[in-house]
Amino acid sequence: METVKVTRKDLLLSPENKEIDSLDDVSALLSQRLSNVFEFSIASEEVQSDEVFEDTYPNDDQATFNLFSDVNTVVTKVTEPSIKNSRPLNYYILEDSPERQRQLQASVFTYDQLMKAKEEKWPACQKLHKVVSIKKEESKHRRRPSKKRRIRMKLLREKEEQLKRQAMAAKRNRFRKNVRKLPNKKKH
């Protein structure tokens, strides 16, 4: 392609930029310029505009444009059989059959049976050591002394132990002194 230098002066003075009075002239000029650039084929005016639209866009669901849908969304219409979520009537209402009546009769506990069971001894209930009695004094728990009090008590115990040790040491020393004062007995 050749590069052509175009100035503003050339554009303003060019014979193509005449004032166009009618719309037909404008559309003809526009179509001429577009056909030079894009190489469009001009459709004949004989075909009605409704017919052109119907030919290019048939009534298909696939051709519809969803404005707010995702680009990658694929819609598949899969119909699944509906599930019946209700229970059968025999779940709520029982039929009275002879077998069911026999089962009920076997599980019934009569008054006479209850009175007989009352007279029977229950060995597990006879053991007195299973009974727990709680006295009021036992329920009170001794509170733990505070930290300061525990430290004081520990110091007092240490002091008492030290005094005992000193007393024992003094007693031993007195005993040793007494032993030294005793006359020695000679063995013959």
Curated annotation (Swiss-Prot):
Keywords: Nucleus, Phosphoprotein
The UniProt record lists the keyword RNA-binding: no
Domain of life: Eukaryota
Modified residues (Phosphoserine): S14
GO cellular component terms, semicolon-separated: nucleolus; nucleus
Biased composition (Basic residues): 171-188
InterPro entries for this protein: DUF2011 (IPR018555)
Annotated segments matching region Disordered: 165-188
UniProt entry tagged with the keyword Nucleus: yes
Protein known as: Uncharacterized nucleolar protein C630.06c
